[in-house]
Amino acid sequence: MPKLKTKSGAKKRFKVTGTGKVMHAQRGKRHGMIKRTKKQIRQLRGTRVLFKTDGDNVKKYFLPNA
């Protein structure tokens, strides 16, 4: 049976760490920033770890070779 292809949209959105955790960009920074405080905007920087169950689903269905 051939290998499953990785979903190209997931390649751009998720990164798997060496320990198997799935990292993703923080949500909520596309629009509507004018009504947020500087502290709120600053805290949205960087990446976060997905919950284990969500990360397992991402690896199973979207990143099968990770």
UniProtKB/Swiss-Prot annotation:
Keywords: Ribonucleoprotein, Ribosomal protein. It comes from the Bacteria. Signal peptide: none annotated. GO terms for molecular function: structural constituent of ribosome. Residues 1-15, 24-40 have a biased composition (Basic residues). Residues 1-40 are annotated as: Disordered. The keyword Ribonucleoprotein applies. GO terms for biological process: translation. Coiled coil: none annotated. One of its GO terms (cellular component) is cytosolic large ribosomal subunit. HAMAP family: Ribosomal_bL35. This is Large ribosomal subunit protein bL35. It comes from Bradyrhizobium sp. (strain ORS 278).
